[in-house]
Amino acid sequence: MNTKKLTRLASLCAICVVTRINFSIIPNVQILSDIILILAIDARLDESLIVNAITMTVTSFFLGFGYWVLFQVLDFGLLGIINYFLFNKLGLVKNDISKSLAVGISGFLYGLIITLMEVFLVSGNKFSFLGLYAGSIPFDINHMIGNIAIYLLLIRKLEKYITGEKIFKNID
């Protein structure tokens, strides 16, 4: 890993940590989701997994540790892998519409996967799953809408910098 890539990843982790902590008052609206998924969609799965693991670990010092941290890392990792394969192995067209749909659907699926993991850990009862999932649907919708809005308003414009295709120039 060269210095430019390491610096870019460290910067992405810092952005994700700061925004995750500061946006924690808005349920499930996170720049982190979009950055992890866009890295995976743009064939940088290794970077996606690194940013995911580091961000979740560091933010847990501020927001609290628990079994859910592992679930979040696994969930975002799984969604990153799924998007990586859809766009890079199965050849899904990479345009703004498909990326918006991918980050939106991934935001919704995030809640489903987290709920499944919690039910298997806590009780394994189908009724507890239905109750937990019904309670999480408004947050999942919020996550989906937030991901799409963040992608269209911010990430789309910065995508080439996030993926390292463009670099910021020094002003001398």
Residue ranges, per PLM feature:
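Hydrophobic transmembrane alpha-helices
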Residues: 1-42, 46-50, 54
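Hydrophobic alpha-helical transmembrane segments
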Residues: 6-11, 38, 46-53, 70-74, ...
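Lipid-exposed faces of alpha-helical membrane segments in multi-pass integral membrane proteins
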Residues: 11, 15-19, 54, 58, ...
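Interfacial aromatic-anchored transmembrane helix boundaries in multi-pass membrane proteins
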Residues: 17-31, 53-87, 127
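Hydrophobic side chains within alpha-helical segments
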Residues: 23, 33-37, 75-78, 118-121, ...
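Transmembrane alpha-helix boundary and packing residues in multipass membrane permease domains
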Residues: 37, 56, 80-84, 115, ...
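Structural signal for the C-terminal ends of transmembrane alpha-helices
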Residues: 41-46, 82-91, 156-163
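Membrane-embedded alpha-helical hairpins and interfacial helices in multi-pass inner-membrane proteins
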Residues: 66-70, 92-172
